[in-house]
Amino acid sequence: MATLIYVDKEIGEPGTRVAAKDVLKLESRPSIKALDGISQVLTRRFGKTYDAPSALPKATRKALGTVNRATEKSVKTNGPRKQKQPSFSAKKMTEKTVKTKSSVPASDDAYPEIEKFFPFNLLDFESFDLPEERQIAHLPLSGVPLMILDEEGELEKLFQLGPPSPVKMPSPPWECNLLQSPSSILSTLDVELPAVCYDIDI
């Protein structure tokens, strides 16, 4: 094998001068050098260079050969097994289709209790009407805030109210006595504040 020779400049003559810009252009292109009648493409390399051996040792060849053979055998053994699995005879296929047809559940007549699983009508939940004794459609409820009625008498007074008129406006029961609201609402309104400290200079 011919030895590789690295030249510092593109032109192998030691006396030639090359500008810095030309050196960058020349380094990007490989140089062709004729050695012993064989043309070789040479590129500039830095550092130590080692020649690769022409051939691998026999021991490594044997090791790689056995590994390659083992993988080829495993591939070959796996291939036929996959091909053998889907091959079935026509009789076996017909028997399987008959079995699958027989395993299909019977018609709905055999299970009438499935229809009675829901004992109620689902459409009952779609109606939002109140019972007849609790109808509030005739009441003027436009702009009515949340009411808290303690007694049934106040509820009857509310039912006796007529349509609202600007001339005669009765005082609604939910606005008259605000202090008579339940104590639970008042307890939610109580907030404990920290003690006042007068020592701080402003």
UniProtKB/Swiss-Prot annotation:
Task: State the residue spans of region: Disordered.
Answer: 60-105
Which InterPro entries is this protein grouped with? Answer: Securin_separation_inhibitor
Ordered alphabetically, the record's keywords are: Cytoplasm, Nucleus, Proto-oncogene, SH3-binding
Gene Ontology MF terms: SH3 domain binding
Specify whether Cell cycle is a keyword of the entry: no
Does the UniProt entry include the keyword Oxidoreductase?
no
Pfam families hit by this protein:
Securin
One of this protein's GO BP terms? homologous chromosome segregation
Q: What is its main location?
A: cytoplasm
Domain comment from the record reads as follows:
The N-terminal destruction box (D-box) acts as a recognition signal for degradation via the ubiquitin-proteasome pathway.
Q: What is this protein called?
A: Securin-2
